């Protein structure tokens, strides 16, 4: 499998509970390498822009509220098949449906406060990385 890069976020529900290290360790233990990382407090405009694909969904307002309620760690992860590997270690969107040992099973509070984000395909990974990072901020 090819070496890929994907975009990941440790969401405010998790940073507020001081889980940045614990979640990053789970990503690293799964074979992913953090090649860029920064801590941001998203503006409403940034959150709405990032999640624009969901703007007509009923949970959009709540999603933007949650994402602007505290700091987020935005990261670029690199590794073999990184996009799928990250989705696997994250677990299902709703933690009630997440497999044992996944980040969302272990740490998420609810479908809205589900601790992590990960790109779902190569195209979205490229877009999402570009949304938060310049090329020089990524050090492989
Ligand atoms: N979300 C929510 N309620 C829902 C579906 C999604 O609050 O019914 C939030 C949740 O935080 C999720 C995000 O919207 O992580 C993006 O949804 P998506 O379906 O893309 O899930 P993901 O890719 O994050 O698993």
From Swiss-Prot:
Major localisation: cytoplasm
Gene Ontology molecular-function annotations: ATP binding; metal ion binding; nucleoside diphosphate kinase activity
Entry annotated with the keyword Transmembrane: no
Domain of life: Bacteria
Cell compartments where the protein resides: Cytoplasm
Cofactor(s) for this UniProt protein: Mg(2+)
Family: Belongs to the NDK family.
Protein name: Nucleoside diphosphate kinase
Organism field: Rhizobium johnstonii (strain DSM 114642 / LMG 32736 / 3841) (Rhizobium leguminosarum bv. viciae)
